[in-house]
A protein has these predicted regions:
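ANL superfamily AMP-binding
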Residues: 13, 28-53, 84-85, 89, ...
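Conserved AMP-binding/adenylation subdomain of ANL enzymes
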Residues: 174-197, 201, 205-245, 259
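Conserved AMP-binding/adenylate-forming
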Residues: 20-23, 39-86, 409
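AMP-dependent adenylate-forming
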Residues: 3-26, 124
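AMP-binding/adenylate-forming catalytic core of the ANL superfamily
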Residues: 83, 100, 236, 246, ...
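ATP-dependent adenylate-forming carboxylate-activation enzymes
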Residues: 56, 77-90, 104-106, 221-241, ...
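ANL superfamily adenylate-forming
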Residues: 109-154, 162, 169-183, 259-260
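Gly/Ser/Thr-rich phosphate-binding loop
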Residues: 152-154, 218-219, 243-248, 259-321, ...
């Protein structure tokens, strides 16, 4: 059900609790504020199908602004707070957003944005931005006259070039309380419902945290919103609010497990019924250690921003099939295919495809959309894996060379494109290398131009070069030098050969 129905049935029930302060926002308050947001969007001339963007850190008002967009038929783009102004300018331009709401805590970046877009600030003043709170206060809290369902248009992980906006097909039912398949899965498979107290640990600009928290609201539960993840604070929040569900990435588990034993034992986490994780591969020993600590509540799923398919596995199943990301659930069927689109038998490695009833497209990129389909029309995220005889999926590789560091997806091509413009760089490959805490770290392998001496001074210079234009998460943590990168006569870079040097295995796929 849409949150407005919970506002009518249980108006005083907390929809959101701010973890750090205990401040509670009721369903009645969320409904009223989201109506004001919808009224404001209409007053600014936004109509169904238009896009708007949010550049915010975690704040309870995120939900009112997003639900306001959802109930006014808008496509909302949530932008990472880690991006630089040029990176944000690209997304604003590519998406065609007509309105940007930026947080005052991100003032320095927000003021450097040059894209032509109407601008509102939240949580304080930003030069060139109008404060959104006063504008919201001036709006009626009644629903707009032409309510219809909007949705997220999030920017997907890319392996080459810049990220692309994912346009999912609009709901067949335009009503704002239409059936949301993810909410049904959350209820039927993970047991989320009106009694859920859900710990939200990650930034809401990510697809998963935003999608899961909105599902909790659809199901009538309570979201406990952390401003940012801290391992001991997460344990304290579970105990304080008796959280029984939450969403994590493997890096969170690593940080939790690195807490001293006396700290880990200090908090009661017995209320947890499901700790849902995804976003990056979880090392088997890490997942096993979490199950040993929290019990068989460490549940997993595999999906992408594209929403073309979904697999999931409960902890008890995983203990019988360690390493699996589960079986397909929902409307889409799972297929493993070769490069020609032929379906492969069990235990044979190939590309992972889904066959959803309605599929996505990449905004402004029909070629990329076409590349994601095979001859049957099935779509892939570019991952490689195999299934067993019972349909359980095991991933053996990930999207071509995309780096996942701390659950954040990083596009190597963008970093390579910047580094190769440095006068000392003849050629470059950016890969992910193992990192105990973050899962992977960004490594740049540089072929210097003839006559340039490699070494620490050049590495420092190239690091500074990256920091001028790239966000911190994209700046290489390590820079190595080689005499020559392995390229085919056609110019194709055998990046797999480079990456595998850091992972200690021989290349199988180039």
């Amino acid at each position: 059900m849409h949150p407005y129905r919970h506002a009518a049935a249980t108006p005083d029930k907390p929809a959101i609790i701010v973890a750090e302060t205990g401040q509670a926002i009721s369903y009645a308050e969320l409904n009223a504020r989201s109506n004001q947001a919808a009224q404001l969007y209409r007053a600014q001339g936004l109509k169904p199908g238009d896009k708007l963007a949010f550049f915010l850190e975690n704040t309870p008002d995120c939900f009112a602004l997003v639900w306001g967009a959802q109930r006014s038929g808008l496509l909302f783009v949530c932008i990472s707070s880690k991006l630089t102004a040029p990176e944000i300018d690209y997304i604003l331009s590519d998406s065609g957003a007509k309105l940007l709401v930026a947080g005052a805590s991100l003032r320095s970046v927000a003021e450097a944005i040059t894209a032509e877009v109407k601008r509102f600030s939240h949580g304080g003043s930003i030069d060139g931005y109008d404060p959104v709170e006063a504008l919201l206060d001036a709006q009626p809290s009644a629903p707009i006259a032409d309510e219809c369902a909007g949705s997220a248009m999030l920017y997907s992980s890319g392996t080459t070039g810049r990220p692309k906006g994912v346009l999912r097909p609009p709901p067949e039912d335009p009503a704002i309380d239409h059936v949301v398949p993810l909410a049904m899965l959350a209820n039927m498979f993970f047991g989320l419902g009106p009694d859920t107290v859900y710990l939200s640990t990650a930034p809401l600009y990510h697809a998963a945290p935003l999608g899961w928290t909105m599902c909790v609201h659809i199901l009538g539960g309570t979201v406990v919103l952390m401003h940012h993840f801290e391992p001991e604070a997460a344990l304290a929040n579970i105990e304080r609010y008796r959280c029984n569900a939450g969403q994590f990435v493997p890096t969170h588990f690593v940080r939790l497990l690195k807490l001293p034993e006396e700290v880990r034992r200090r908090y009661d986490v017995s209320s947890m019924k499901t700790a849902i994780h995804a976003a990056a591969p979880c090392p088997l020993p890490v997942k096993q250690a979490m199950i040993d600590w929290w019990g068989p509540v460490i549940d997993e799923y595999y999906a992408g921003t594209e929403g073309n398919g979904f697999t999931a596995i409960k902890a008890a199943e995983w203990l019988q099939r360690r390493g699996s990301v589960g079986r397909a659930i929902g409307e889409a069927t799972l297929h493993i295919c070769d490069e020609d689109g032929n379906e492969l038998p069990p235990r044979t490695e190939g590309m992972v495809f889904f066959n959803p009833p309605r599929s996505f497209e990449y905004h402004n990129d029909p070629a990329k959309t076409a590349e994601s389909r095979n001859k049957h029309g099935w779509s892939t995220l570019g991952d490689v894996g195999w299934v067993d005889e019972d349909g359980y999926l095991f991933l053996t590789d990930r999207k071509s060379f995309m780096i996942i560091s701390g659950g954040v997806n990083i596009y190597p091509q963008e970093i390579e494109n910047h580094l190769v413009t440095h006068p000392a760089v003849a050629d470059v490959a950016v890969v992910g290398a193992p990192h105990d805490e973050m899962g992977e770290q960004v490594v740049a392998v540089i072929q210097p131009v003839p006559g340039v001496a490699p070494g620490p001074e050049l590495a420092d210079e190239l690091t500074a070069w990256c920091r001028q234009s790239l966000s911190g998460v994209k700046t290489p943590r390590r820079i190595d030098f080689v005499e020559e990168l392995p390229r085919h006569a056609t110019g194709k870079l055998y990046k797999r050969l480079i990456r595998d040097r850091y992972w200690g295995k021989e290349s199988r796929i180039v």
